[in-house]
A protein has these predicted regions:
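Helix-turn-helix repeat elements of alpha-solenoid scaffolds
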Residues: 1-12, 40-51
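Solenoid-like repeat scaffolds
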Residues: 13-24, 51-63, 97-107
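Residues that mark the junctions of alpha-helical repeat units in TPR/alpha-solenoid scaffolds
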Residues: 26, 65-67, 115
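TPR-repeat structural position
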Residues: 5-6, 43-44, 82, 88-91
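Extended, well-ordered alpha-helical segments in internal regulatory regions
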Residues: 72-83, 127-134
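C-terminal non-catalytic interaction modules
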Residues: 89-169
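Short coil/turn linking the two alpha-helices of tandem helical-hairpin repeats
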Residues: 2, 22-24, 39-41, 61, ...
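"A position-specific structural signal for the A-helix of alpha-solenoid helical repeats
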Residues: 25-39, 69-71, 75-78, 121-122, ...
């Protein structure tokens, strides 16, 4: 994935000056840069970019807001799972805030909310698995199998390949 994003990053750097809407060009570039670092497992750098460029929950540029916040939640979950002393409150607060945001009337239709709601459901299940079931090592593999089965039941879900990766770790 990293090589693919090297090409995308190079493309964005070359094309950014030619985009008419400079604000949109900057958002697109920064989001590309965030994804570039995310797929290199550099979650702290990804979060720094996202926190700099995207104010929380703006309705103008909704597609960018949804992608940025989904990516932010992925980073917080990965850091919570991978770094022993990382504060899990970051994940829990971001997930709850995003749930409230997408649930607000007029932000998204019910059909468009569903993949994000399913994403949050799975993120919370992965979070709980890593902090409850992993205390008993004998439950690790059966727990992963259950989580993967639960994930496969979702027809519409955001970030499914990444969620699979998190479960398999």
């Amino acid at each position: 994935a990293v090589g693919k994003f090297d090409i995308q990053l190079s493309f964005m750097e070359r094309c950014k000056p030619y985009l008419e809407n400079k604000e949109e060009a900057e958002k697109a570039y920064q989001l590309t840069l965030a994804y570039y670092h995310f797929f290199q497992d550099n979650y702290h750098k990804t979060l720094a970019i996202l926190n700099d460029i995207y104010p929380r929950y703006i309705t103008g540029g909704l597609a960018y807001t949804l992608r940025a916040n989904t990516l932010q939640i992925c980073c917080y979950l990965a850091l919570t799972v991978r770094e022993k002393h990382y504060d899990s409150d970051h994940f829990e607060n971001a997930a709850e805030s995003f749930r409230k945001f997408i649930s607000r009337e007029g932000i998204l239709s019910a059909e468009k909310k569903k993949p994000f709601q399913n994403f949050l459901t799975m993120c919370n299940a992965i979070f709980k698995f890593h902090f409850k079931e992993l205390m008993d090592k004998s439950r690790k593999e059966p727990g992963k199998v259950r989580l993967l089965a639960k994930l496969e039941k979702f027809y519409r879900i955001t970030s499914k390949p990444w969620l699979k990766k998190m479960i398999r770790e």
